[in-house]
Amino acid sequence: MDVMRSVLGMVVLLAIAFLLSVNKKKISLRTVGAALVLQVVIGGIMLWLPPGRWVAEKVAFGVHKVMAYSDAGSAFIFGSLVGPKMDTLFDGAGFIFGFRVLPAIIFVTALVSILYYIGVMGILIRILGGIFQKALNISKIESFVAVTTIFLGQNEIPAIVKPFIDRLNRNELFTAICSGMASIAGSTMIGYAALGVPVEYLLAASLMAMPGGILFARLLSPATESSQVSFNNLSFTETPPKSIIEAAATGAMTGLKIAAGVATVVMAFVAIIALINGIIGGVGGWFGFAHASLESILGYLLAPLAWVMGVDWSDANLAGSLIGQKLAINEFVAYLNFSPYLQTGGTLDAKTVAIISFALCGFANFGSIGVVVGAFSAVAPHRAPEIAQLGLRALAAATLSNLMSATIAGFFIGLA
């Protein structure tokens, strides 16, 4: 029964995308079908097949080892504030976001910059991009951007496409925005993992976002023009560093900007949520609903969607609330509020944890529209009006991609 509910959830999400399509007659069943199959296959390999699960577990172990090295750098700056004694001192509540999550983002961004400098990332992107392009019957630039989003976030996509943004047609531009919103950056993945989110889920969600972003981009905005971009004019960085030291330093400074942005937004929005909850609770108290909050309202509104995705009805309000927080605010705040349920002795079952973990794994939120419009407009001011028009539709496509990955995850966890 649960498995069939997950299948129903996939159908519902596809139906929503079809209804939102701007040109239903031009939808390519070849591309849409291949993207859906690839998204399901990646989910099955990572979550259901023993070899795939083994690989995911090993990668997760490696990520945790990387995080341990990040803690070494944090400890040099903050001393015992990142040590295990903090948990003892504060009775298990010694995890400080600013001392554990933000330094990890800086470290991993520097590491990724080094990997780009020595050519590892470029080779991976070119190989995977070529395979992806043939499998899904999409343009080379679309496959390039989709694969790049495994490693980089939506903030970096404009810099990547800048050398040829004038040659991008409207559909390719839309796909680039969707892919960025549907994915997460490697640096922020470390941040989510530091909050207790299972790394194997984050890794699987990141990989599934590749075909997922293409799937819903092509459903909502089918391709109607031929591509004018080839792999011969792709550039991985706008101004390549001249040495490995410069690459590390540049990456660290970029990581600092990302960490500062994350800290600023999370701090502001947590405070804003507290204010909103105070207002809602105060007004609700006049009518006997003193405990009403933004989270509870979002939970009620999105609970049916969470249920059809595979979440038990008893947990649907919580899942709906977290999905709503991610959409209205951002994924960091949602994961932050999800974190207590991931602790030892949590009340959620494995399937619900997986579905929520996947559903929150992406940059798709209303704030991202502003980020995308601002970032793309900076490299292509003349296309700013067009980018602004695509923003809301791209958010819908990216959100559906995240929810589809979550539904597929629930399907395979239910089979296990």
Provide a role label for each language-model segment.
Residues 68-138:
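Hydrophobic alpha-helical hairpins/lids featuring a short glycine-rich hinge
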Residues 126-160, 226-247, 294-298, 326-327:
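Juxtamembrane inter-helical linkers in multi-pass membrane proteins
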Residues 253-344:
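Transmembrane helical segments that form the transport core of multi-pass membrane transport proteins
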Residues 210-258:
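Long, contiguous bundles of hydrophobic transmembrane helices that form the permeation core
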Residues 1-11, 100, 292-294, 356-366:
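Structural signature of hydrophobic alpha-helical transmembrane segments
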Residues 135-194, 320-408:
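Alpha-helical membrane segments and immediately flanking helix-loop junctions
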Residues 9-20, 35-47, 105-114, 183-191, ...:
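Hydrophobic core segments of alpha-helical transmembrane domains in multi-pass membrane transport
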Residues 45-81, 230, 276-301, 314-322:
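Interfacial/capping segments of alpha-helical transmembrane domains
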